[in-house]
Every structure is written in structure tokens, then in C-alpha cells.
């Protein structure tokens, strides 16, 4: 019987670095998490996962079965380096190939949701042409995802093109495809001049998961919980009252900390306390 508890997960980059997924999932289980979100970022090391052999993919599946800790989502931030909106055809082609490989990887290992980075370009100057190419790239990507039955979900970003749920909904309406949805980050959403609660309500019906982190205006990473501007209790209340029942993912970058597990436990307890105040069922 499926649990009615709220699924609470941890980002891979919060845990000690390394390629042994059995160890990582065992640690996540010990720390009380239901799932781990995989990162495929712009580094060669993590990008190489998309070229894993059949045996390496099977090892991940076996680790999931052995531990009972799922890997249901992938944070695909590699498109910073290979953006779908690039005016360099070769770079854009690499971006689309990364998307194809990520979707195939997800299909092979049971990942259900690929979180997309909402950058038309990241290291270059954006313009109308980069935005057009980005839209076309998303359209092509969603067609691939549809065939594989893998959901692509847009993150609310630290970047003006996709810094609100309202803007991301524009792409959802443009693509008009059930395999394209939203994966908001309440930290990023709160760091901009957004009516956060109204934005969350607007996204209901399209939100497939929620990133949980603290931020300050202009500071989108490594803000300790409780030291930023995010009103977690109100965000959790709004999502609960709006009928959202999906997973929450604590996003941290403590993999290089002296004691990553201790940092994660501290964050986990802080977040769960805010969830309890919001009247949500505590995650295990």
C-alpha cells in the first residue's frame, strides 16, 4: 500500500561526492529520505553518466531495489554549457543530443522527471533568436520525451527568462503537451519580485515536484535555511491548500563540506519543522 506521507528527497550534491550509488542511497535512507535526485550538470564527470554501459545502469537499478530509496528525478543543468538556444549550431546540436541521451537514460533506469534549466543561453548574450531557438529546442525535446513517457519539467530559475511560474506556464501552453510540466524552486521564486503564493496557486495542476531551498535577492545558492527571504510555512500551506500532494526535494550543495551528513540532518530537521507548522504530514 502506498504511503500517504509526503515524499521528501535530497539532492545528490548535498551528499558526499562519488560514483557509488549503493552507498549514496544507503546514506540517504539512514538520513530519513525517500528519494535522491540525480545531477547531470555541465561537468564532464557527471555528463559521462549519460554514456553509462548497460551494466552501470543496471547497478543503479539494483541499488534502488536493494535500498528502497528511489531515484525518480534528474536535475539536468548541463544545458548551461550546451544551451538549446545557442546560435552556434554545433553547440545547440550537442544540447539536443544531451537531451536525447538523458531521456534514454531516464527510460532505462526508471527516472520519471527530468528537471530542465530555463536558460535560452547562459554564458552568452540572449536575444530574440536565442529565445526562438530555445522554444524550438523545447518542442523537439518534448516530442522525444513523449515517445519515451518521460516528463520534462521546467525549473523556476535564477534567470529572467524563467523566473516565475507565470512565465513557465507560457511555455507549457505553447507546447501544449502533458509530458511538459513545471518543477518550481520556492527559493528562486521568492528571490524575485513575485507574488509567491499567487504564483504557486497558478501552477497547481502543472507542478510535478518542488525544490526547497532558501535564497536572498541576487543570491541563489548556499543560503543557510532560515537566513534568507523564503516564507517556507506560507509556501507549504499554499501548496497543501491548493491540493498539491507531490514530492519535495531539499536542494543543497554540501558534498564538499567537512561533514555533509551533519549539514543535511540540520537542514532536514529545519524543513520538517516548517512543514509541521504548516499542517503537513511529516515525511519519514
Swiss-Prot record:
Keywords: Isomerase. Its EC number is 5.1.3.22. Pathway: Cofactor degradation; L-ascorbate degradation; D-xylulose 5-phosphate from L-ascorbate: step 3/4. It comes from the Bacteria. The keyword Zinc does not apply. GO terms for biological process: L-ascorbic acid catabolic process. Induction: Induced by L-ascorbate. Repressed by UlaR. Pfam families: AP_endonuc_2. One of its GO terms (molecular function) is intramolecular oxidoreductase activity, interconverting aldoses and ketoses. It catalyses: L-ribulose 5-phosphate = L-xylulose 5-phosphate. PANTHER family: ISOMERASE, L-RIBULOSE-5-PHOSPHATE 3-EPIMERASE ULAE. Belongs to the L-ribulose-5-phosphate 3-epimerase family. Catalyzes the isomerization of L-xylulose-5-phosphate to L-ribulose-5-phosphate. Is involved in the anaerobic L-ascorbate utilization. This is L-ribulose-5-phosphate 3-epimerase UlaE. The gene is ulaE.
Amino acid at each position: 500500500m502506498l504511503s500517504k506521507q509526503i515524499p521528501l528527497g535530497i539532492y545528490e550534491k548535498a551528499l558526499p561526492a562519488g560514483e557509488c550509488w549503493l552507498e549514496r542511497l544507503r546514506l540517504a535512507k539512514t538520513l530519513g529520505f525517500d528519494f535522491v535526485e540525480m545531477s547531470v550538470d555541465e561537468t564532464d564527470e557527471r555528463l559521462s553518466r549519460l554514456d553509462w554501459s548497460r551494466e552501470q545502469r543496471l547497478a543503479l537499478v539494483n541499488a534502488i531495489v536493494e535500498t528502497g530509496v528511489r531515484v525518480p528525478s534528474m536535475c539536468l543543468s548541463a544545458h548551461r554549457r550546451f544551451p538549446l538556444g545557442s546560435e552556434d549550431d554545433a553547440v545547440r546540436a550537442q544540447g539536443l543530443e544531451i537531451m536525447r541521451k538523458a531521456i534514454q537514460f531516464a527510460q532505462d533506469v526508471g527516472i520519471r522527471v527530468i528537471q530542465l534549466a530555463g536558460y535560452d543561453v547562459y554564458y552568452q548574450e540572449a536575444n530574440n533568436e536565442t529565445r526562438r531557438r530555445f522554444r524550438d529546442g523545447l518542442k523537439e525535446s518534448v516530442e522525444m520525451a513523449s515517445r519515451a513517457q518521460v516528463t520534462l519539467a521546467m525549473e523556476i530559475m535564477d534567470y529572467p527568462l524563467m523566473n516565475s511560474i507565470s512565465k513557465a506556464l507560457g511555455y507549457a501552453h505553447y507546447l501544449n503537451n502533458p509530458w511538459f510540466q513545471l518543477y518550481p524552486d520556492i527559493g528562486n521564486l521568492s528571490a524575485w519580485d513575485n507574488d509567491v503564493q499567487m504564483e504557486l496557486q497558478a501552477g497547481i495542476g502543472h507542478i510535478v515536484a518542488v525544490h526547497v531551498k532558501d535564497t536572498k535577492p541576487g543570491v541563489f545558492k548556499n543560503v543557510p535555511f532560515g537566513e534568507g527571504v523564503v516564507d517556507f510555512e506560507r509556501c507549504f500551506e499554499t501548496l497543501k491548500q491548493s491540493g498539491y500532494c507531490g514530492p519535495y526535494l531539499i536542494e543543497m550543495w554540501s558534498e564538499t563540506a567537512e561533514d555533509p551528513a551533519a549539514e543535511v540532518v540540520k537542514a532536514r530537521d529545519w524543513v520538517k519543522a516548517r512543514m509541521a507548522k504548516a499542517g503537513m504530514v511529516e515525511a519519514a
